[in-house]
Every structure is written in C-alpha cells, then in structure tokens.
C-alpha cells in the first residue's frame, strides 16, 4: 500500500474533496498523475484513468449539497477503498450526510431527494478504463448522464440538455414522432412527464418489434456502426465529441443510429426492468445496455466510413431482395390457384414459356403471364381466391376466445393434478360430450378446442398409468392398425388419426421379442448376420416389393440359433473368423431355401438371382452362391488355413438341410402392391415434408384426411398422381421423390422453415393444434419493416396497421418464428444456399456468365432510377464506391451494368450465345497454345528472350498471359506456328500412346505361365560376401529386435517363421524393399525431381543434364513383379513371403552392383547399392540388444573420450549429463521410459478388454 501513503501525503489526510474548487482539483489531479507516472500497476492505471472524471464528479455531487449541506467525502478513504476493491458503489447516506464508498455485494436502492430508483441486474461497464460493476444509479452514473442529459428530481423528467443525448433524441424522435419534433422545434424535446410516457411507449413498441429477432441480419451489420469520434484525452474539459453534433445527417443515417442503439439494447435478458416508477425504462435500458461504453469506445474514422458504405450497400440490396420476395410469393399463390381452379393445361403452357432458354427469372413476368393466359372472369376468380385465403387466416388470428388460455395452461402444466383441474374447466366448453372420433369444438367460438386423445392422455397421466397401459389405450386413436402392420417391419411410431400428434413408439426390440432364446449374448454376431443379409439383397431378385429389413430380421431369427448349436463355435462376446464364416454359410443357405421354396410353392413370392431364370435348377443356384461366397469373403477364408473349398461346400449342404428341417418350405408373403407402395410413400420423410408445406400454404386441408376421398385428394396434390396411376408405371419405385411441387422447391423450403419454427412455438404455448401461422404474417412483418426504413416518420401508422395481423400467439412470439424465414437463402441471390440440400442448379444461358468476347461479366456499375418522374436526372449510373456520395433516397436501384461489355443484367439473354461459345472456344485454344510455348520455342530448344522478345520466334513475353491487349500480335503469332503446334502435340500424344497401349502382334501368342517361386540361398551368400558380413545378418533383416548381435551373426536365437500375414517382420522387410526401390527410382528419374534426396543429389552432382536424363535409359527396371508376388505369398504362405522379400532385396542389390557399362554409371550405381543396403542393415542393428552393437558407426563424437570403447560394454557411449542441453535433451525425448516402471501387471491391464 505504498501508493496509498504517497497519495495521502499529497492530499493530506482527511481532506474533503467536496471542499476543493475546480483549480485545486486540477492541480491535485496533475500532482497525482505525475507521482504515479510510469507505474505499471493495474490499480494505479485504473486510478489515473478515473481521475479524468474527478472534476465532473465533484461538480455533480456539489450540486446535490444544497439538499444535503453537510455532505462530505474523505479523499484518502475513497482512494484507499478504490485501490483495494475497484468494484465499488459510491452512495449518499442521509443519516451520516456523507458520500462514502462500499463494495457492491447486494442489490442497492439508491436514494436521492427521497425518490427510490430500484436497480436491475448487475451489468459491467467501463468508465475510462475503470471497471465498475454498478448495481445502482451511482453518482458516477449520474455524472455521466450529465454529459448526455440531466436528471431533474422535481419533475422526474428527462431533459435533453446535453449535446450528445439531444442529438440522439432528435434522431429518435424523428423516427417515432414527427409531429412532436415539429411542435417543439430544435429546443428541448422532452420536458414533461406526459411526453416521457409517450416517448417511452413508442420506444417500447419499436424495441419489441426489433427485439423479436426477425431482423438480425441487419442488426448484426449495424453492430459495427460506431457513430462517435475518438476521444481527445488531451483536452479533459471536452469528453465526448459526436459526429451528429456538428453535421447534418441524412434520414437513412439517423435510422441506422436508432437500430444500432436498439441492437445494444437487444443484448439484455428482459424487455422490462424492475422499477418503481412506471415511466423510466428508457433510462434503465440506456444504462443496462452499456450505451455509455459505446460512446466512450474510440473508433477510427476510416473504419466508420467503410462500415457506413458497406451497410448502405447491404440495405439497398436487401430492399431489392425483399421486394423480389414479396412479388415472388404473390406469383406463386396466383400460379397455384390457377392450377386448382382452372386446370393444369394453361399452367403447363405458362411453365413452358417461363422456362424458355434466355428467359430471366422475374416474378413480375409470372404475374403478367398468369393474367395474360386468363380471361377477365378467370383473372377475377384468381384475385378473389387470393383475397379469400388472406381473410381465412385473419379470422383465426383475431380469435380471442378464453379457451386459448386454458389449453395453454393444460399443455404447459408441470404437475398432472394441476393439468387435470384445467381439463375439467375445458370440458365445460365442449360442444359435444363423449366425442372420440373427431375434434372437440368450443361451444363459445366454434373453433377446434382439444383432441380426444389429449383428454384421455391427461387422465392416464394423472392416474400414473404405465407406459404400456397408455400405449394400449391410445391405440384406438391411431391411424395405423398395430396387429396388421407389426410383422412387416414398416411402422415404428403411431400417430393420432384426428390431430396427427405422435401417440407411441415401437422400437425394433418390440417386433423381435421372440428372439429371446439367445438374448444379447453375442450382439455383434446378430448385427453381422443382419448386415450381411442386407448386402445379399444386391444380387437377389424379388418378384414384388418387399421390406428388405423384414427379410434380414427373419434371417437373424433363422440362422442365429442354428449357429449357436454348432459344437465348435465359441460362445463368447468376441467372435473369430470361423464364426463369421459359419454365419455367412447359414445366410446363403437361408437364401437358397427361399429360392427352393418359391419353386415348390407357387403361392410364395418368387425369389431368384439377378441374371438367372426363376426355373433354374437347384444345382445352378448352389454353384452361384458358393462362388459368390468364396469371392466376397475371401479375406475371412484366407485367415483360416484349414478351410478348403470342399469344407465350405460340405458345411453349406449341412446348413441347408438344417434350415429345411427346422423351418420347412419358407417364403416371404406376397403383399398387396398398393398397400406396400402407399405405406412406404406416406412414411417417407419427403412426402411428410411436402404434405406439411401443402397444408401451410392452403393447398390441402389442415386436418388429416378423414375419408378415402380426402386421402386420395391429398395424395394426388402432393405427389401429382393418384395411387392407381403410380402402380401403372413400373419405374415409379425408383422415382418416388418426384413431386408436383419440385419446380417450386425454393418456396417450399421457405414455408417449411416457417412451419418448424411455428411448431416449436406451438409446443411452447401449449400446443394449440388448430392454429397455424400463415405466410401472411411474416410477409406483413417484412413489409412493415421496409416501410419503416423508407418512411420512418409514419412509423406509428404502420405499427397500427401491423396490429391487424397480430394473432393469438402475440406479436413478439409470432415474429420470433420469422427469424429462420430466410436463413437458408443466399441474401445476394434470393435463392437457396448452395450448402443446403434445398439448393438446385438452374439452367442458364452461357451469356449470363460471359460476354460475346468470352470475358466474364463484372456487375460493378449500379443503375439507379428516380422514384419521382420529375426528378432530374432520371437515371444515374455509379460505381460501388460512389453509391453513398451520389445516391440519396430519391433514387431506387433498377439494374446492374457490366463494366466489361456494358450490357445491363436483365439484357444478358439477348446476347448471341453462339458468339459467346465461339469466343470461349477461341480463348481456350489460345490459352492452351501459349501455355505450350511458354518456355519451349517452336524454332527448337527454349526461348531466347532479349528485351522481352524471343530472338528466334518473335514471341513477346507480355502476350503469353494477356491475349486481349494486343490482339493482332496474338493472332499473327498463333497463325504462324499453328501447324507446328499441331505436329508437336500429335507427336507427344503418339509417344504417350505407345507407352500406354500395347499393340497386339499379328500372331497371337499364349501368355507364358509364371513359374512358381523357389528360394535361392546363393543370392544371400553372394551379397554377404560383397558386404563382408555373415549371411545370417541378411537373413535376420526384420527380426533383429531384442536379440544379441553376436547371436545374430551366428544365426542363433532366430524366431520361428511367420505364420500370419500380419506378422511385423513381413512389414519391416517389405518397408526396407520399398525404401530401396523408392530411392533407386529417385536416382533413375532424377532429371524429373526438383529436390531429390540429398545424398542421391551428391552422387550425380558431377553429371550433366543430358547424362541425368540418360539414367532412365541405361539403368534397368528392377521392380518387376515384386508387389504382386509378395501380396500373394503374404496371404498364402507368410514364411515364404519373408524369404522372398529378403531374396528380392539381394537380387536387386546384385543387379545394380554388377552393372559394367556405361563406364560413367558404374561407380555411381555401386556406391548407391552399397549405401542403401548398409543403411538398411545398420538400421536393423539399432534394434538389437545394447552392448552388442558398435556405436562407432555414428562417428567418434558419439563415444566419450577416455572411456572404454569396447563393443561389449554399454558404458562405451556417454549418458546424459546433469547440466545444460543434456538435461533438456533428456526431458524432450518422447520415447524415454527411463523413469517409468512398467510391470507385467500394468501390461496385462493394457490388454484389450
């Protein structure tokens, strides 16, 4: 606390800061700042920052001294408390008549002039770097409010006397109350309690509207909008400088500031804070949202301008997109009404016109085409129907019956007894008693009240009935019969046939409960049988539609008990390859029994194999299944060395007999095609998706079909055809997902997004099933917001208009669903985002991307037209950077112009497509031509550029990549060497074809049979003699780990030959061979490497480039058939595979070592072969036991000088020291286990469980 003592010495203990005048305060601040200058202590930094506000703080508190004449504040006590605990609250105490500091440990009520101001939740706020967690309107807060306004206790009003808040309220009042602004002029805007209440009310309405989250796309952008300049700290007298204080701001800028301010408010947890005075929410929201912090946060002016420009562009583009969306929705509705009321003939004709090549997608053109195709009476019919759809929704929206609140309480109740009481109140409103077949209607309003199954469900829950009991009793409301459908494996969930709500779940275990003989002893085997049976369906041909899951379930039930009865099968949770092979055999035997049974009993479903006739002999099927089994499961069979083809055939025969003996003739029941097809379609997620959307937009009734006629109408509306028509088309099964609505998939996605948002709200508000939110309320909300942006002074009228469309969910909840309305769309194109499954590629003419010269369009010129015809000029074309400077609200964006070809965007369909294609083809030809001659010269060799021009062929460097700046030079050079280019290109292609294509000889010779491999030990002896080592060392490659090197040289302690294809020795030797071959190929093809291995580059550094290219010709290819032979031996004979790899390594070494010509290659290839093989052997030696290896191979520096360098002593190499790098190296070694005690018990615990 030395800093406190220093300050106390300066200030003098007991000094009352309220007794100091302004000059004394400034001198005191300067003295303290100079004393603490250069201090890095965070508390001192906070204190220095806080001293900026000391004078204003004292002046504000001194203003309150008139009411509290004995008010005092000891400076030392204040500073000491500030340093100890920065989270403080200075408060005024009437009893002690002093200003004191206390920690903010509980909710405070700040008392000033007898007025209680209750304070909301804690919000951190930063005042010039001093972080205070203020829970009350402290003197600091009021002092800060003094900068942007004054709080007058006499009237409890908010007077805009401060410059910043004056301008802000002017802006805000411009938006919400134009009349008040004109009436009060440029003086004080809000002076009375009545004005404050009116002002606050307007603010709350606007705040609720934006708080709902529907315009987050704009608010997030505006979050970057900081409207105040950087604070000039050198001038302590002027604290805040506002942009709007000295400039005349356009209405659009004012609107952005309002929305930005509301964005700050939207971070709060509740709309209305707790307060005792009912007209103070604005002050609390200003405080809680941290708006003061925003004012004090310095922002660079350049960033401000960039943010403003970008925001203006986004707002302009958004206006265009919103208008497009509004017109598109109307056009879609018109189109659907036309299809339903007039017929599909005219709608199909319109669709053909709209999808013509070169036609721009314009919703206005859809409306025009629809009206044009109809007569006067038909047009009136469509318009009238469109208005009727709106009115139907308005009736539901205006419903304010008391039963809505009761249903909400019923579905959101937390206790069953409480819900039961509410149910009794609802039953009084039933129009009919004991109704169990349809909705219970409200006798007061006539709308749907409650589904009967919900009534029964509440009673069962209150009686604490079991889940099985509830499921059984609720089944009478199910639209699907459990007994008829349970064995087909199709139905897993049951839904109410009245309201569509889910009743119960039926999972897989419910339908296969009879498989309890074995239980879950081997769930892995059960899953294996099920999966392999499903795979077998790929080659099985069923005569009619079947449920393949049911087919697999039966296979599990049939095969699993028989497999467990086999004596030599382990009854363990982990199954070995033998168990898997038995499972495959029994699966194929089950398939054979189905085929055999279908031949014997014609009532069974015909089952055969793809490509085979149904009446084929049983032997033919057996042959096919055996071949299929041995091919597809060769990996399992190869792991079992004792398994032969005869063994598989014998067990397959036994399995077939057991299945026939246990099950007899077995077949799949022939199902009704109509029933199977309709069931699969109705349960398909895409059908449910399309039907849901069709209900939302009014194409089909909201309720589930009650009669066969309604069901057929729904099916035909969603799919586009009746079930009978579908069954007449055999290929339909592969095209289930072809819907009538597919051309309007984007619109469906929008409506579906609304639906799911509404569903979540429905659950939240108690599940009123009868009410659905229409498209209208969302379109109306956006229409309102657009009008608000365009005509802010009339916001009150628009808000009143919006009230007409507010439904029973409440305005805020309805708009909350709007949030996801456009989430899945690209805001720039208005179409589905490409990252979603809703995205579809649209066929566009090539002229929409390229102009007639083959250049891509650049839409960087904005074309604006005057809104008012009297405005001059009538049209303005500006670049993106000049939009803010030259465009005001008198102009609207009309089109975009390409800066390359100067065509308007809506005129791209008029470009000559053939010219575009020809130009693109020519551009591609030029690119290929000049890329070919980028470095090679058509005159031979490489280009010889001098002054950017090749002296041999005349090619200029600047036309290689730029074909447009000098078109004459480009064409002249191309025409001069086009023939040469064609010849060289064909020559290269012919050479490549000779390499890739083997030309058959005139006389076809039979391919020579590859002789079986036999081991040649002489190759190992010859290699060992050259290397001067024991042949046993070469034989031990891959098997030196943990063996003494002395034993290795003598051939003692060698492990037995490998018996598994996964033996690590096989992988080690194979890796050594691959490394040898890789490095050899690097040497052989070194001319093609930019950075070959370092030591290989050293071997050939003295060779010329031509000699390096010739290495590929003079050096032989030693790879041959190594990889193929090794893979075969590894599976069939692992021991031979190990010997083969070692022998191949020796053969490759000897082939290279014995090369004798050309002479300039001999030394290079011998050094390479010796280096490679020695490196492989030395790497293996590192794995042998310590003490048996000569570490001198690493050089003398590795061995400690003066120590015994014996090959048999481990102390021959130095251990890490105790200081410096030795310790660091030891700590950083990731493989060091010196200090780890690994016992056998630990290793046992690490074994897989």
Curated annotation (Swiss-Prot):
The answer to whether keyword Repeat applies is no
Cell location = Virion; Host cytoplasm
What does induction of this protein depend on? Expressed in the late phase of the viral replicative cycle.
Q: What is its main location?
A: virion
Which cysteines are cross-linked by disulfides? none
Q: Which GO terms describe its cellular component?
A: host cell cytoplasm; virion component
Q: Determine the domain of life of the protein's source.
A: Viruses
Q: Which one GO biological process term can you cite for this protein?
A: symbiont-mediated suppression of host cytoplasmic pattern recognition receptor signaling pathway via inhibition of IRF3 activity
Query: Keywords assigned by UniProt?
Result: Host cytoplasm, Host-virus interaction, Inhibition of host innate immune response by virus, Inhibition of host IRF3 by virus, Inhibition of host RLR pathway by virus, Late protein, Viral immunoevasion, Virion
**Keyword Iron in record:** no
Protein function: Together with the penton and the other minor capsid proteins (p17, p49), forms a complicated network immediately below the outer capsid shell, stabilizing the whole capsid. In addition, blocks IFN-beta transactivation mediated by the cGAS-STING pathway and regulates the transcriptional activity of IFN-beta. Mechanistically, suppresses the phosphorylation of host key adapter protein TBK1 and degrades host IRF3 in the cytoplasm.
Q: How does it assemble?
A: Interacts with the minor capsid protein p17 and with the hexon capsid protein p72 capsomers; these interactions form a rigid zipper structure that stabilizes the capsomers. Interacts with host IRF3.
Family recorded in the similarity comment: Belongs to the asfivirus M1249L family.
Q: What is this protein called?
A: Minor capsid protein M1249L
Q: Which organism is it from?
A: African swine fever virus (isolate Tick/Malawi/Lil 20-1/1983) (ASFV)
